[in-house]
Protein backbone atom coordinates (compact mmCIF):
# COMPACT_ATOMS: atom_id res chain seq x y z
CA UNK A 1 0.00 0.00 0.00
CA UNK A 2 2.80 2.39 0.96
CA UNK A 3 4.77 1.47 -2.14
CA UNK A 4 1.74 2.16 -4.35
CA UNK A 5 1.11 5.47 -2.63
CA UNK A 6 4.77 6.42 -3.00
CA UNK A 7 4.63 5.52 -6.68
CA UNK A 8 1.53 7.67 -7.17
CA UNK A 9 3.24 10.53 -5.36
CA UNK A 10 6.29 10.12 -7.54
CA UNK A 11 4.20 10.13 -10.70
CA UNK A 12 2.27 13.19 -9.49
CA UNK A 13 5.50 15.02 -8.71
CA UNK A 14 6.90 14.12 -12.08
CA UNK A 15 3.77 15.38 -13.82
CA UNK A 16 3.78 18.57 -11.76
CA UNK A 17 7.47 19.12 -12.47
CA UNK A 18 6.84 18.61 -16.17
CA UNK A 19 3.84 20.93 -16.04
CA UNK A 20 5.84 23.54 -14.13
CA UNK A 21 8.77 23.18 -16.49
CA UNK A 22 6.54 23.54 -19.53
CA UNK A 23 4.86 26.54 -17.93
CA UNK A 24 8.19 28.21 -17.18
CA UNK A 25 9.40 27.40 -20.68
CA UNK A 26 6.23 28.93 -22.11
CA UNK A 27 6.64 32.05 -19.96
CA UNK A 28 10.30 32.32 -20.91
CA UNK A 29 9.44 31.92 -24.60
CA UNK A 30 6.68 34.49 -24.27
CA UNK A 31 9.02 36.87 -22.45
CA UNK A 32 11.73 36.47 -25.09
CA UNK A 33 9.18 36.95 -27.87
CA UNK A 34 7.78 40.10 -26.24
CA UNK A 35 11.30 41.44 -25.66
CA UNK A 36 12.17 40.79 -29.29
CA UNK A 37 8.92 42.42 -30.44
CA UNK A 38 9.62 45.41 -28.18
CA UNK A 39 13.15 45.76 -29.54
CA UNK A 40 11.92 45.51 -33.13
CA UNK A 41 9.16 48.08 -32.51
CA UNK A 42 11.64 50.48 -30.91
CA UNK A 43 13.94 50.06 -33.91
CA UNK A 44 11.07 50.72 -36.32
CA UNK A 45 9.90 53.78 -34.37
CA UNK A 46 13.41 55.24 -33.84
CA UNK A 47 13.11 54.87 -30.06
CA UNK A 48 16.28 54.26 -27.99
CA UNK A 49 16.47 50.62 -26.94
CA UNK A 50 16.97 51.22 -23.23
CA UNK A 51 14.99 54.43 -22.59
CA UNK A 52 12.50 54.03 -19.69
CA UNK A 53 10.04 55.72 -19.67
CA UNK A 54 9.79 56.25 -23.40
CA UNK A 55 10.52 59.64 -24.93
CA UNK A 56 7.59 61.42 -26.54
CA UNK A 57 6.35 59.71 -29.72
CA UNK A 58 7.84 61.29 -32.83
CA UNK A 59 8.11 60.65 -36.52
CA UNK A 60 11.29 59.54 -38.17
CA UNK A 61 14.33 61.74 -37.58
CA UNK A 62 14.60 63.36 -41.00
CA UNK A 63 16.08 66.66 -39.80
CA UNK A 64 19.65 66.13 -41.05
CA UNK A 65 18.42 65.35 -44.57
CA UNK A 66 17.12 68.92 -44.92
CA UNK A 67 20.28 70.80 -43.90
CA UNK A 68 21.83 70.94 -47.38
CA UNK A 69 18.66 72.46 -48.85
CA UNK A 70 18.58 75.37 -46.39
CA UNK A 71 20.11 78.76 -47.22
CA UNK A 72 23.90 78.85 -47.04
CA UNK A 73 25.37 81.55 -44.81
CA UNK A 74 28.98 82.69 -45.12
CA UNK A 75 31.10 81.45 -42.24
CA UNK A 76 28.62 78.74 -41.21
CA UNK A 77 29.67 75.10 -41.35
CA UNK A 78 26.71 72.79 -41.91
CA UNK A 79 28.45 70.07 -39.89
CA UNK A 80 27.64 72.09 -36.75
CA UNK A 81 24.02 71.05 -37.13
CA UNK A 82 24.86 67.59 -35.78
CA UNK A 83 26.86 68.82 -32.77
CA UNK A 84 26.21 67.05 -29.50
CA UNK A 85 24.95 69.85 -27.28
CA UNK A 86 25.43 69.00 -23.60
CA UNK A 87 22.33 69.48 -21.46
CA UNK A 88 22.45 71.94 -18.55
CA UNK A 89 23.58 70.42 -15.25
CA UNK A 90 20.74 68.63 -13.49
CA UNK A 91 20.06 68.37 -9.79
CA UNK A 92 18.57 65.35 -8.02
CA UNK A 93 14.77 65.44 -7.94
CA UNK A 94 13.51 65.46 -4.32
CA UNK A 95 11.56 62.33 -3.41
CA UNK A 96 8.50 64.38 -2.43
CA UNK A 97 8.50 66.07 -5.84
CA UNK A 98 8.59 62.72 -7.59
CA UNK A 99 5.72 61.43 -5.43
CA UNK A 100 3.66 64.53 -6.22
CA UNK A 101 4.35 64.11 -9.91
CA UNK A 102 3.53 60.40 -10.05
CA UNK A 103 0.35 60.80 -7.97
CA UNK A 104 -0.92 63.67 -10.12
CA UNK A 105 -0.24 61.82 -13.37
CA UNK A 106 -2.09 58.76 -12.08
CA UNK A 107 -4.98 60.95 -10.99
CA UNK A 108 -5.10 62.63 -14.39
CA UNK A 109 -5.13 59.26 -16.16
CA UNK A 110 -7.93 57.99 -13.92
CA UNK A 111 -10.14 61.08 -13.63
CA UNK A 112 -9.02 63.58 -16.27
CA UNK A 113 -8.11 66.16 -13.60
CA UNK A 114 -6.67 69.33 -15.12
CA UNK A 115 -3.82 69.80 -12.63
CA UNK A 116 -1.01 67.68 -14.11
CA UNK A 117 2.25 66.51 -12.60
CA UNK A 118 4.27 69.32 -14.17
CA UNK A 119 1.89 71.95 -12.79
CA UNK A 120 3.10 71.22 -9.26
CA UNK A 121 6.48 72.74 -10.10
CA UNK A 122 5.09 76.04 -11.28
CA UNK A 123 4.91 79.06 -8.99
CA UNK A 124 1.35 80.34 -9.25
CA UNK A 125 0.34 84.01 -9.24
CA UNK A 126 -1.66 84.80 -6.07
CA UNK A 127 -3.71 87.36 -8.04
CA UNK A 128 -4.98 84.62 -10.35
CA UNK A 129 -7.78 83.73 -7.94
CA UNK A 130 -8.69 84.78 -4.38
CA UNK A 131 -9.20 81.13 -3.43
CA UNK A 132 -7.36 78.35 -5.30
CA UNK A 133 -10.06 75.90 -4.22
CA UNK A 134 -12.51 77.80 -6.44
CA UNK A 135 -10.19 77.52 -9.45
CA UNK A 136 -11.11 74.75 -11.90
CA UNK A 137 -7.49 73.63 -12.14
CA UNK A 138 -5.68 74.65 -8.94
CA UNK A 139 -8.22 72.94 -6.70
CA UNK A 140 -6.72 69.59 -7.72
CA UNK A 141 -3.29 70.47 -6.32
CA UNK A 142 -2.09 67.79 -3.85
CA UNK A 143 -2.44 69.68 -0.56
CA UNK A 144 0.12 72.38 -1.34
CA UNK A 145 0.92 75.00 -3.97
CA UNK A 146 3.96 77.12 -4.82
CA UNK A 147 2.94 80.79 -5.13
CA UNK A 148 4.35 84.29 -5.72
CA UNK A 149 2.95 87.78 -5.26
CA UNK A 150 3.00 89.73 -8.56
CA UNK A 151 4.81 93.09 -8.44
CA UNK A 152 1.85 94.90 -10.07
CA UNK A 153 -0.90 92.97 -8.28
CA UNK A 154 -2.25 91.64 -11.60
CA UNK A 155 -2.91 88.02 -12.60
CA UNK A 156 -0.41 87.93 -15.48
CA UNK A 157 1.70 85.98 -15.97
CA UNK A 158 -0.34 83.22 -14.31
CA UNK A 159 2.76 81.33 -13.24
CA UNK A 160 6.53 81.09 -13.25
CA UNK A 161 8.67 77.98 -13.10
CA UNK A 162 10.49 77.13 -9.89
CA UNK A 163 13.96 78.71 -10.04
CA UNK A 164 17.26 76.80 -10.01
CA UNK A 165 15.50 73.44 -10.16
CA UNK A 166 15.28 70.16 -12.04
CA UNK A 167 11.69 68.97 -12.11
CA UNK A 168 10.58 65.32 -12.49
CA UNK A 169 10.11 65.92 -16.21
CA UNK A 170 13.89 66.66 -16.29
CA UNK A 171 13.53 70.33 -17.30
CA UNK A 172 16.24 72.52 -15.78
CA UNK A 173 15.60 76.14 -14.81
CA UNK A 174 17.98 78.99 -14.01
CA UNK A 175 17.91 81.53 -11.21
CA UNK A 176 14.95 83.34 -12.84
CA UNK A 177 12.90 80.18 -13.30
CA UNK A 178 13.55 80.35 -17.05
CA UNK A 179 14.36 77.17 -18.93
CA UNK A 180 18.10 76.63 -19.25
CA UNK A 181 21.36 76.50 -17.34
CA UNK A 182 22.73 78.93 -14.73
CA UNK A 183 22.87 82.63 -15.54
CA UNK A 184 24.01 85.75 -13.73
CA UNK A 185 21.66 88.71 -13.59
CA UNK A 186 24.36 91.33 -14.17
CA UNK A 187 25.65 91.60 -17.74
CA UNK A 188 29.21 90.50 -18.49
CA UNK A 189 31.66 92.38 -20.74
CA UNK A 190 31.61 91.55 -24.46
CA UNK A 191 28.37 89.64 -24.19
CA UNK A 192 25.31 89.80 -26.43
CA UNK A 193 22.17 88.86 -24.50
CA UNK A 194 19.25 87.50 -26.56
CA UNK A 195 15.95 86.49 -24.92
CA UNK A 196 13.23 84.43 -26.60
CA UNK A 197 9.64 84.96 -25.48
CA UNK A 198 6.53 83.00 -26.36
CA UNK A 199 4.49 80.08 -25.16
CA UNK A 200 4.75 76.28 -25.32
CA UNK A 201 6.31 76.28 -28.79
CA UNK A 202 9.29 78.17 -27.33
CA UNK A 203 9.67 76.59 -23.90
CA UNK A 204 9.07 73.22 -25.63
CA UNK A 205 8.35 69.87 -24.01
CA UNK A 206 9.79 69.68 -20.51
CA UNK A 207 11.03 66.14 -21.22
CA UNK A 208 13.35 67.27 -24.01
CA UNK A 209 17.02 67.94 -23.20
CA UNK A 210 16.86 71.31 -24.99
CA UNK A 211 14.42 73.81 -26.44
CA UNK A 212 15.22 75.42 -29.78
CA UNK A 213 16.60 78.67 -28.23
CA UNK A 214 19.28 76.60 -26.49
CA UNK A 215 20.37 75.25 -29.87
CA UNK A 216 20.47 78.84 -31.16
CA UNK A 217 22.85 79.77 -28.34
CA UNK A 218 25.13 76.83 -29.07
CA UNK A 219 25.28 77.54 -32.81
CA UNK A 220 25.93 81.27 -32.29
CA UNK A 221 28.86 80.63 -29.96
CA UNK A 222 30.20 77.99 -32.36
CA UNK A 223 30.02 80.56 -35.16
CA UNK A 224 31.69 83.29 -33.08
CA UNK A 225 34.56 80.98 -32.16
CA UNK A 226 35.05 79.87 -35.77
CA UNK A 227 35.07 83.49 -36.94
CA UNK A 228 37.42 84.63 -34.18
CA UNK A 229 34.83 87.07 -32.84
CA UNK A 230 35.54 88.05 -29.24
CA UNK A 231 31.90 87.96 -28.16
CA UNK A 232 29.90 85.49 -26.09
CA UNK A 233 26.24 84.97 -26.93
CA UNK A 234 23.94 84.48 -23.97
CA UNK A 235 20.65 83.09 -25.30
CA UNK A 236 17.85 82.83 -22.73
CA UNK A 237 14.32 81.41 -22.82
CA UNK A 238 11.65 83.28 -20.83
CA UNK A 239 8.72 81.41 -22.43
CA UNK A 240 6.13 79.27 -20.69
CA UNK A 241 3.16 77.30 -21.91
CA UNK A 242 -0.52 78.25 -22.11
CA UNK A 243 -0.17 82.02 -22.38
CA UNK A 244 -1.08 84.55 -25.05
CA UNK A 245 0.41 87.85 -26.15
CA UNK A 246 -0.86 89.80 -23.12
CA UNK A 247 0.81 87.34 -20.76
CA UNK A 248 3.99 87.51 -22.83
CA UNK A 249 3.93 91.32 -22.58
CA UNK A 250 3.67 91.01 -18.78
CA UNK A 251 6.67 88.65 -18.72
CA UNK A 252 8.70 91.07 -20.81
CA UNK A 253 7.79 94.00 -18.56
CA UNK A 254 8.36 92.24 -15.22
CA UNK A 255 11.09 89.71 -15.98
CA UNK A 256 12.87 90.41 -19.27
CA UNK A 257 13.34 94.20 -19.26
CA UNK A 258 15.36 94.20 -15.99
CA UNK A 259 17.90 91.80 -17.58
CA UNK A 260 18.79 94.52 -20.14
CA UNK A 261 18.79 92.26 -23.24
CA UNK A 262 20.18 93.39 -26.57
CA UNK A 263 17.49 91.56 -28.51
CA UNK A 264 14.14 89.98 -27.63
CA UNK A 265 12.64 87.55 -30.16
CA UNK A 266 8.86 87.03 -30.18
CA UNK A 267 7.68 83.63 -31.45
CA UNK A 268 4.00 82.83 -30.92
CA UNK A 269 1.00 82.33 -33.17
CA UNK A 270 -1.06 79.46 -31.85
CA UNK A 271 -2.82 80.25 -28.58
CA UNK A 272 -4.90 83.12 -30.03
CA UNK A 273 -5.37 81.57 -33.45
CA UNK A 274 -9.17 81.43 -33.39
CA UNK A 275 -11.01 81.43 -36.70
CA UNK A 276 -14.38 81.80 -34.98
CA UNK A 277 -14.17 85.59 -35.18
CA UNK A 278 -14.72 85.50 -38.95
CA UNK A 279 -16.66 82.26 -39.23
CA UNK A 280 -20.00 83.34 -37.82
CA UNK A 281 -22.15 80.37 -36.85
CA UNK A 282 -20.28 77.12 -37.45
CA UNK A 283 -21.18 73.50 -36.69
CA UNK A 284 -20.10 72.54 -33.21
CA UNK A 285 -17.50 69.90 -32.55
CA UNK A 286 -19.09 66.54 -31.66
CA UNK A 287 -19.32 66.26 -27.89
CA UNK A 288 -17.13 63.77 -26.04
CA UNK A 289 -19.22 64.05 -22.88
CA UNK A 290 -21.35 61.04 -23.77
CA UNK A 291 -18.42 58.77 -24.44
CA UNK A 292 -17.92 55.95 -21.97
CA UNK A 293 -14.89 56.39 -19.72
CA UNK A 294 -11.92 54.19 -20.59
CA UNK A 295 -12.16 50.69 -19.19
CA UNK A 296 -9.53 48.86 -17.13
CA UNK A 297 -7.86 47.40 -20.23
CA UNK A 298 -7.61 50.81 -21.90
CA UNK A 299 -6.19 52.32 -18.70
CA UNK A 300 -3.66 49.50 -18.42
CA UNK A 301 -2.63 50.01 -22.04
CA UNK A 302 -2.28 53.75 -21.51
CA UNK A 303 -0.03 53.24 -18.49
CA UNK A 304 2.02 50.60 -20.31
CA UNK A 305 2.48 52.94 -23.28
CA UNK A 306 4.71 55.16 -21.13
CA UNK A 307 7.22 52.32 -20.89
CA UNK A 308 6.72 50.08 -23.92
CA UNK A 309 6.88 50.95 -27.62
CA UNK A 310 4.82 47.85 -28.35
CA UNK A 311 2.08 48.99 -25.96
CA UNK A 312 2.25 52.47 -27.50
CA UNK A 313 1.69 50.93 -30.94
CA UNK A 314 -1.31 48.97 -29.65
CA UNK A 315 -2.77 52.09 -28.01
CA UNK A 316 -2.27 54.11 -31.19
CA UNK A 317 -3.81 51.34 -33.30
CA UNK A 318 -6.86 51.34 -31.06
CA UNK A 319 -7.09 55.11 -31.48
CA UNK A 320 -7.02 54.75 -35.25
CA UNK A 321 -10.36 52.97 -35.11
CA UNK A 322 -11.95 56.40 -34.56
CA UNK A 323 -10.09 57.99 -37.49
CA UNK A 324 -11.69 58.14 -40.93
CA UNK A 325 -9.60 57.89 -44.06
CA UNK A 326 -5.97 56.97 -44.50
CA UNK A 327 -4.19 60.06 -43.20
CA UNK A 328 -5.96 62.60 -45.39
CA UNK A 329 -8.13 65.40 -44.00
CA UNK A 330 -11.28 64.13 -42.32
CA UNK A 331 -14.74 64.97 -43.70
CA UNK A 332 -16.07 68.24 -42.28
CA UNK A 333 -19.36 70.12 -42.57
CA UNK A 334 -19.74 73.26 -44.65
CA UNK A 335 -19.33 76.75 -43.16
CA UNK A 336 -18.60 80.25 -44.47
CA UNK A 337 -15.74 82.56 -43.53
CA UNK A 338 -16.83 86.21 -43.40
CA UNK A 339 -13.71 88.07 -44.47
CA UNK A 340 -13.70 91.70 -43.25
CA UNK A 341 -14.93 94.00 -46.01
CA UNK A 342 -12.13 95.80 -47.82
CA UNK A 343 -9.32 93.97 -46.01
CA UNK A 344 -6.50 93.26 -48.48
CA UNK A 345 -5.36 89.73 -47.71
CA UNK A 346 -2.03 90.09 -49.53
CA UNK A 347 -1.14 93.55 -48.14
CA UNK A 348 -3.04 93.90 -44.85
CA UNK A 349 -3.68 97.23 -43.16
CA UNK A 350 -2.32 96.52 -39.68
CA UNK A 351 -4.18 99.47 -38.15
CA UNK A 352 -7.59 97.87 -38.68
CA UNK A 353 -9.50 96.81 -35.58
CA UNK A 354 -11.24 93.94 -37.39
CA UNK A 355 -8.20 91.86 -38.28
CA UNK A 356 -9.01 88.16 -37.74
CA UNK A 357 -7.47 85.62 -35.33
CA UNK A 358 -7.09 88.17 -32.49
CA UNK A 359 -4.40 90.10 -34.35
CA UNK A 360 -5.48 93.54 -33.02
CA UNK A 361 -4.89 92.29 -29.46
CA UNK A 362 -1.54 90.76 -30.42
CA UNK A 363 -0.35 93.91 -32.20
CA UNK A 364 -1.38 96.03 -29.22
CA UNK A 365 0.68 93.80 -26.96
CA UNK A 366 3.64 94.03 -29.35
CA UNK A 367 3.33 97.83 -29.08
CA UNK A 368 3.60 97.49 -25.29
CA UNK A 369 6.59 95.17 -25.57
CA UNK A 370 8.37 97.61 -27.93
CA UNK A 371 7.70 100.50 -25.57
CA UNK A 372 8.98 98.63 -22.52
CA UNK A 373 12.12 97.42 -24.29
CA UNK A 374 12.92 100.88 -25.63
CA UNK A 375 13.30 102.11 -22.04
CA UNK A 376 16.41 99.96 -21.66
CA UNK A 377 17.68 100.36 -25.25
CA UNK A 378 16.64 96.83 -26.19
CA UNK A 379 15.46 95.73 -29.61
CA UNK A 380 12.45 93.58 -30.53
CA UNK A 381 12.51 91.06 -33.38
CA UNK A 382 9.46 89.17 -34.61
CA UNK A 383 9.44 85.68 -36.04
CA UNK A 384 6.87 84.20 -38.36
CA UNK A 385 5.03 81.21 -36.89
CA UNK A 386 4.93 77.84 -38.61
CA UNK A 387 1.86 75.60 -38.78
CA UNK A 388 2.06 72.05 -40.09
CA UNK A 389 -0.95 72.42 -42.35
CA UNK A 390 -1.68 72.94 -46.03
CA UNK A 391 -4.52 72.09 -48.35
CA UNK A 392 -4.31 68.47 -49.47
CA UNK A 393 -1.90 67.44 -46.70
CA UNK A 394 -1.74 63.65 -46.23
CA UNK A 395 -0.11 62.28 -43.08
CA UNK A 396 0.90 58.90 -41.73
CA UNK A 397 -2.04 58.06 -39.44
CA UNK A 398 0.26 56.24 -37.01
CA UNK A 399 3.35 58.44 -36.85
CA UNK A 400 1.49 61.73 -37.22
CA UNK A 401 -1.56 60.86 -35.15
CA UNK A 402 -1.38 63.99 -33.00
CA UNK A 403 -1.10 66.32 -35.99
CA UNK A 404 -4.21 64.69 -37.43
CA UNK A 405 -6.10 64.97 -34.16
CA UNK A 406 -5.23 68.63 -33.59
CA UNK A 407 -6.15 69.68 -37.12
CA UNK A 408 -9.33 67.61 -37.37
CA UNK A 409 -10.62 67.56 -33.80
CA UNK A 410 -9.03 70.55 -32.07
CA UNK A 411 -9.80 72.87 -35.00
CA UNK A 412 -13.08 71.30 -36.13
CA UNK A 413 -14.80 72.22 -38.43
CA UNK A 414 -12.17 74.37 -40.13
CA UNK A 415 -10.59 73.01 -43.28
CA UNK A 416 -6.87 72.64 -43.86
CA UNK A 417 -7.21 75.23 -46.61
CA UNK A 418 -8.63 77.86 -44.28
CA UNK A 419 -6.21 77.06 -41.46
CA UNK A 420 -3.29 77.45 -43.87
CA UNK A 421 -4.82 80.61 -45.32
CA UNK A 422 -5.16 82.28 -41.90
CA UNK A 423 -1.72 81.11 -40.77
CA UNK A 424 -0.18 82.73 -43.86
CA UNK A 425 -2.22 85.88 -43.28
CA UNK A 426 -1.07 86.08 -39.66
CA UNK A 427 2.55 85.91 -40.82
CA UNK A 428 1.96 88.64 -43.41
CA UNK A 429 0.58 90.84 -40.61
CA UNK A 430 3.65 90.10 -38.46
CA UNK A 431 5.93 90.99 -41.38
CA UNK A 432 3.99 94.21 -42.07
CA UNK A 433 4.17 95.17 -38.39
CA UNK A 434 7.93 94.61 -38.37
CA UNK A 435 8.37 96.76 -41.51
CA UNK A 436 6.17 99.53 -40.11
CA UNK A 437 8.27 99.80 -36.96
CA UNK A 438 11.71 99.03 -38.38
CA UNK A 439 12.03 95.72 -36.54
CA UNK A 440 13.96 92.63 -37.67
CA UNK A 441 11.67 89.95 -39.08
CA UNK A 442 12.84 86.33 -38.95
CA UNK A 443 10.84 84.35 -41.51
CA UNK A 444 11.13 80.97 -39.83
CA UNK A 445 7.90 79.70 -41.41
CA UNK A 446 9.23 80.28 -44.93
CA UNK A 447 12.63 78.74 -44.16
CA UNK A 448 11.78 75.76 -41.95
CA UNK A 449 11.35 72.51 -43.93
CA UNK A 450 7.70 71.53 -44.27
CA UNK A 451 8.13 68.01 -42.90
CA UNK A 452 5.58 66.43 -40.53
CA UNK A 453 8.35 64.27 -39.03
CA UNK A 454 9.67 67.46 -37.41
CA UNK A 455 6.34 68.05 -35.65
CA UNK A 456 4.68 66.41 -32.66
CA UNK A 457 1.36 68.11 -33.45
CA UNK A 458 0.41 70.96 -35.77
CA UNK A 459 2.58 73.55 -33.97
CA UNK A 460 4.87 71.77 -31.48
CA UNK A 461 8.10 70.19 -32.67
CA UNK A 462 9.68 66.82 -32.06
CA UNK A 463 13.19 66.93 -30.62
CA UNK A 464 14.75 66.77 -34.13
CA UNK A 465 12.32 69.55 -35.03
CA UNK A 466 13.58 71.64 -32.10
CA UNK A 467 17.13 71.26 -33.40
CA UNK A 468 15.99 72.20 -36.90
CA UNK A 469 14.14 75.30 -35.67
CA UNK A 470 17.22 76.28 -33.68
CA UNK A 471 19.37 75.92 -36.80
CA UNK A 472 16.95 77.86 -39.02
CA UNK A 473 16.66 80.68 -36.46
CA UNK A 474 20.46 80.77 -36.14
CA UNK A 475 20.87 81.09 -39.93
CA UNK A 476 18.38 83.97 -40.00
CA UNK A 477 20.07 85.72 -37.07
CA UNK A 478 23.63 85.66 -38.41
CA UNK A 479 23.20 88.49 -40.98
CA UNK A 480 21.47 90.67 -38.37
CA UNK A 481 24.21 90.03 -35.81
CA UNK A 482 26.95 90.73 -38.36
CA UNK A 483 25.34 94.11 -39.06
CA UNK A 484 25.13 94.99 -35.36
CA UNK A 485 28.73 93.92 -34.73
CA UNK A 486 30.03 95.79 -37.78
CA UNK A 487 28.24 98.99 -36.76
CA UNK A 488 29.58 98.81 -33.21
CA UNK A 489 26.07 98.62 -31.78
CA UNK A 490 26.96 95.26 -30.20
CA UNK A 491 28.39 94.36 -27.81
CA UNK A 492 27.22 97.24 -25.66
CA UNK A 493 29.11 98.60 -22.67
CA UNK A 494 28.18 96.76 -19.49
CA UNK A 495 25.24 98.61 -17.93
CA UNK A 496 25.01 99.33 -14.23
CA UNK A 497 22.74 96.69 -12.73
CA UNK A 498 21.83 95.59 -9.20
CA UNK A 499 23.27 92.26 -8.00
CA UNK A 500 19.94 90.41 -8.16
CA UNK A 501 16.86 90.43 -10.38
CA UNK A 502 14.25 92.69 -8.71
CA UNK A 503 11.33 90.46 -9.75
CA UNK A 504 12.78 87.43 -7.97
CA UNK A 505 13.99 88.87 -4.67
CA UNK A 506 11.28 87.05 -2.72
CA UNK A 507 11.57 83.26 -3.11
CA UNK A 508 8.51 81.15 -3.99
CA UNK A 509 6.29 80.19 -1.07
CA UNK A 510 4.89 76.70 -0.57
CA UNK A 511 1.45 77.18 0.96
CA UNK A 512 -0.90 74.46 2.25
CA UNK A 513 -4.09 73.87 0.31
CA UNK A 514 -7.05 71.93 1.65
CA UNK A 515 -9.95 71.86 -0.78
CA UNK A 516 -11.76 68.99 0.90
CA UNK A 517 -13.44 66.41 -1.29
CA UNK A 518 -12.78 66.55 -5.04
CA UNK A 519 -15.47 68.51 -6.84
Give a label for each model feature.
Residues 14, 25, 36, 41-42, ...:
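Histidine-centered active-site loop/cap adjacent to the catalytic His
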Residues 7-30:
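N-terminal Sec-pathway targeting helices
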Residues 224-240:
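Short helix-loop-beta-strand segments that form the rim/entrance of peptidase-like active sites
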Residues 256-265:
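Proline-aspartate-enriched helix->loop->beta-strand connector
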Residues 47-122, 126, 137, 146-147, ...:
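Serine-dependent acyl-ester chemistry module
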Residues 58-203, 207-209, 214-220, 224-227, ...:
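Membrane/wall-proximal cationic-aromatic binding patches
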Residues 235, 241-252:
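Structural motif
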Residues 32-50:
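Membrane-interface motif at the C-terminal end of an N-terminal transmembrane signal
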Amino acid sequence: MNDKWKMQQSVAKARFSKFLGNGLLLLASLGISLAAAEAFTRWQDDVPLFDFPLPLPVGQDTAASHVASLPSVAGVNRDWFSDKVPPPPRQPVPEQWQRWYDDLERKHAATGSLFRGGDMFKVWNTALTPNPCDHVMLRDAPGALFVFDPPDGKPLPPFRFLPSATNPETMVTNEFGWRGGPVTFARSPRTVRIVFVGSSTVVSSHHMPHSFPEFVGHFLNRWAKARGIDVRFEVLNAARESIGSTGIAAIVRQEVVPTRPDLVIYYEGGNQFALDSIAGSVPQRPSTADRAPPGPLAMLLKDAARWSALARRLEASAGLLDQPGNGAEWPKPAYTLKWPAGLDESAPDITRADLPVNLPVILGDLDQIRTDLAKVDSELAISSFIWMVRDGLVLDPMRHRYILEQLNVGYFPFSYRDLARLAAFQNRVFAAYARAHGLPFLDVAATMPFDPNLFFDAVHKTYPGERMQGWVTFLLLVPLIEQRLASGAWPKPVPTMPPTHPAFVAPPRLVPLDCGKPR
